[in-house]
């Protein structure tokens, strides 16, 4: 966290099964000053997921009430479940100087970029479609039909990677995490992000 600047907002997107969630968890554990925006969703929790930590799990009625209140930076219906990013939560973290990670799909990323053009987009790519299919099958949580739908959607999502600022290939977790850390550090060191520090330095010279 920096006392001199508003935090960066990083949008991290990927096709399902690319390892995005694992990468974000590793980045948060090993990199100071980062916070993840906890999304709202209407889907049931998976084993090991905690409310308020992995997601804010809400009913469809609660989610639609928040939509009516314009509480989301973005939201989407994904395979029959709502997902959304709280505008208030993101803005509060960034105002406090934290860099905020939004772990969202490409549809949500486009909505956030429209609302926050300064946000930095990072897309995680699989090394191949064969590896992606193996990862989805290895989860053991989805039917064959759902997996085929996810693979079909993955192709479309990967085509949208051209709209992002950076791409990271996740063929090795440690190397992909290092790539993400380099991106975060480079964005923190932009002159436009250091104006508060420069002004304070000159004022006290």
UniProtKB/Swiss-Prot annotation:
Binding site for ATP: 14-21
Residues in Guanylate kinase-like domain copies: 7-185
Enzyme Commission number(s) of this protein: 2.7.4.8
Gene3D superfamilies associated with the record: Guanylate Kinase phosphate binding domain, P-loop containing nucleotide triphosphate hydrolases
GO cellular component terms, A-Z: cytosol
Role according to the record: Essential for recycling GMP and indirectly, cGMP.
Protein's cellular compartments: Cytoplasm
Reaction equation(s) it catalyzes: GMP + ATP = GDP + ADP
Predominant subcellular localization, coarse grouping: cytoplasm
GO terms for MF: ATP binding; guanylate kinase activity
Entries under Pfam families matching the protein: Guanylate_kin
Protein name per Swiss-Prot or TrEMBL: Guanylate kinase
InterPro entries given in the database record: GK/Ca_channel_bsu (IPR008145), Guanylate_kin-like_dom (IPR008144), Guanylate_kinase (IPR017665), Guanylate_kinase_CS (IPR020590), P-loop_NTPase (IPR027417)
Lineage top rank: taxon: Bacteria
Keywords, in A-Z order: ATP-binding, Cytoplasm, Kinase, Nucleotide-binding, Transferase
Homology family: Belongs to the guanylate kinase family.
């Amino acid at each position: 966290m920096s006392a001199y600047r508003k935090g960066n907002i990083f949008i991290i997107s990927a096709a399902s099964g690319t390892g995005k969630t694992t990468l974000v968890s590793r980045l948060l554990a090993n990199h100071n000053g980062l916070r993840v925006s906890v999304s709202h969703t209407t889907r049931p929790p998976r084993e090991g997921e905690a409310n308020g930590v992995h997601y804010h799990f809400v009913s469809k009625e609660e989610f639609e009430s928040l939509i009516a209140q314009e509480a989301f930076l973005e939201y989407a219906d994904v395979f029959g479940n709502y997902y959304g990013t709280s505008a208030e939560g993101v803005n509060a973290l960034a105002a406090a100087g934290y860099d905020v990670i939004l772990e969202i799909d490409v549809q949500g990323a486009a909505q956030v970029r429209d609302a926050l053009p300064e946000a930095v987009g990072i897309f995680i790519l699989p090394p191949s479609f064969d590896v992606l299919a193996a990862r989805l099958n290895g989860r053991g949580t989805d039917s064959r039909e759902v997996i085929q739908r996810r693979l079909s959607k993955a192709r479309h999502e990967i085509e949208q990677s051209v709209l992002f600022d950076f791409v990271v290939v996740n063929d090795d977790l440690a190397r992909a995490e290092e790539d993400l850390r380099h991106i975060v550090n480079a964005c923190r060191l932009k002159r436009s992000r250091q104006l508060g520090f420069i002004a304070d330095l000159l004022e006290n010279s």
